[in-house]
Amino acid sequence: MEKQRAILESVIKEEIDFISYVDLEDGMVHTIVTNEDADVMPPIDGDYQKVNDVTIPKYVHPEDREMCEREFRLERLQENLQKKERFVINYRLLCGGEYRRKSMNIHYYDKTKMTLVFVRRDVTDNYEEEQNRQREIYDAML
């Protein structure tokens, strides 16, 4: 069991910034797993909308703010999750003085649809690799 826990922790540290969930009955966000190396983390417990009202204007890239304010609203998330099982929001977040690309994967915890689960990953390296690959393809075509 100890080895399994160590493997799980190493995967979390490498792959995600945090895992949190929102109880749709009371609108409270609860953070259950965090990567100590990640910046801009949600509180352990707090009002979901109030957290967004503070963090989005402060940390989200100006060009992504309006989209994040709209797409992260609980009503909007529930609308989008009626159409598909998972919803992903990609945006830029100010971390340590520079903007990093983040991907938030959101889904329902179970069939009761009373709890939303949020998993945030840093995808900056993947994004930059893809941009470089696209540039190389473009340059090769010229």
Feature map (PLM): residue ranges:
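Short linear interaction motifs
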Residues: 1-4, 72, 85, 98-101
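PAS/Per-ARNT-Sim sensory domains
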Residues: 48-76
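Sensory-domain boundary/capping and coupling elements
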Residues: 1-6, 127-142
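Acidic/polar residues at beta-strand termini and the immediately following turn/coil
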Residues: 22-23, 110, 122, 139
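PAS/PAS-like sensory domains
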Residues: 74-89
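Short loop/turn elements at sensory-signaling interfaces that couple input to output
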Residues: 99-127
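PAS-family sensory domain signal
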Residues: 7-59, 108
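PAS-family sensory domains
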Residues: 89-97
